[in-house]
Amino acid sequence: MLTMGTALSQQVDANWQTYIMIAVYFLILIVIGFYGYKQATGNLSEYMLGGRSIGPYITALSAGASDMSGWMIMELPGSVYSTGLSAMWITIGLTLGAYINYFVVAPRLRVYTELAGDAITLPDFFKNRLNDKNNVLKIISGLIIVVFFTLYTHSGFVSGGKLFESAFGLDYHFGLILVAFIVIFYTFFGGYLAVSITDFFQGVIMLIAMVMVPIVAMMNLNGWGTFHDVAAMKPTNLNLFKGLSFIGIISLFSWGLGYFGQPHIIVRFMSIKSHKMLPKARRLGISWMAVGLLGAVAVGLTGIAFVPAYHIKLEDPETLFIVMSQVLFHPLVGGFLLAAILAAIMSTISSQLLVTSSSLTEDFYKLIRGEEKAKTHQKEFVMIGRLSVLVVAIVAIAIAWNPNDTILNLVGNAWAGFGASFSPLVLFALYWKGLTRAGAVSGMVSGALVVIVWIAWIKPLAHINEIFGLYEIIPGFIVSVIVTYVVSKLTKKPGAFVETDLNKVRDIVREK
């Protein structure tokens, strides 16, 4: 019987083409980083938001690639492999959430952030939207971004380290440092433009990989009959409603709630050239997402038949895609498929690093230096932004040094944190004139606290009653909505300018 490490080491050691393909991929990213650096004007908005000049197709794939991360290629197939088709509920929830996000959040956010003081970060938008003169809302929301995104970013570094450990038999820490070096390089120098272009490039690679692997796997197994074989091995494998409890299904489906408040995703809407381009972006983005997620599910299902057929001992389900790509393909193609995993991982890391850097620079450093200095010392602020990328990356690497957690748990905690803190607030800010600063702060903080308390003290009680195992975004989101609404009703109403701005945003969005 082959062990995963033996099978992969034999192939990689014998075929240097795999290493060449990875090296070429890294070289392309470095070139894009230089291109972004050459295009930069020394303006903070250019570095952090691409000067709001990004087209619909780059917007669509960069949003998708930065969203899906290594989770789509490593964790989702592994989850389907372990539990069967019932794991697909998360893909349904995510696709629905992303689709609604394009309609409900994207157009208004693009228009409103420019109208409200040309805000380039979410905390800056909240401040301008609610006339937060003492910056309490801006500071708290900025802190939430820095804390949760550092956690989120470290999950990407964990994925990178695990990839090199599994595929090449290299030390986990070496892989972590290598991935970190490349992604820091093009993010540090190229800024938002480089990150967006690399995300587009990486999104294409990811899509090809997620279509190619399950098709070739079926060709090498029993064709479409592979799914019959999978069902014969265990009937629940192809049952959407078996293998998980009702609470489990609801928890997976509820991931879609998080989309409205994920800064690294909705910043894509802020950077597009015009809100009128969003329908094109939506059509491409949702199509890309649907095909990619279905491909990931297909990898997991075919893997159920593939592993015993090839006598492979799969020690970690999250490495299923790696094993299949190395066993089924020529090393050159295998290198391309490993590059797809790196693409998924690095696209998310770079986006998260840049958003966190934006928050540190725009939401904190600007408070120290002052608004006037920010206007007259743009190059200084760009340099602070670059240094912030480096600092956040170093902290995330330090946390990722101990990889004792699953990718989904790491991502799930951060996703829930943003979903409960920001999703209700973003929706209220874009649609409700009655939102107050006190309501916004209270709702945001209560959502984050509920998520933290649920993870730390409630979830461990799941063995007593499964309701305690509910995904933390649900109670966090509900509490945040209630607190935001109640506190806003009880506190001083904002000025008339809010209703005027909301009406103006609505009218602009309706323009054809």
Curated annotation (Swiss-Prot):
Function statement: Catalyzes the sodium-dependent uptake of extracellular L-proline. Since most S.aureus strains are L-proline auxotrophs, this transporter may aid the bacterial persistence during an infection of tissues with low proline concentrations.
Any one cellular-component term (Gene Ontology): plasma membrane
Catalysis performed (reactions): L-proline(in) + Na(+)(in) = L-proline(out) + Na(+)(out)
Location of this chain's protein in the cell: Cell membrane
Organism of derivation: Staphylococcus aureus (strain Newman)
Domain of life, source organism: Bacteria
InterPro entries: Na/Glc_symporter_sf, Na/Pro_symporter, Na/solute_symporter, Sodium:Solute_Symporter
Name of protein: Sodium/proline symporter
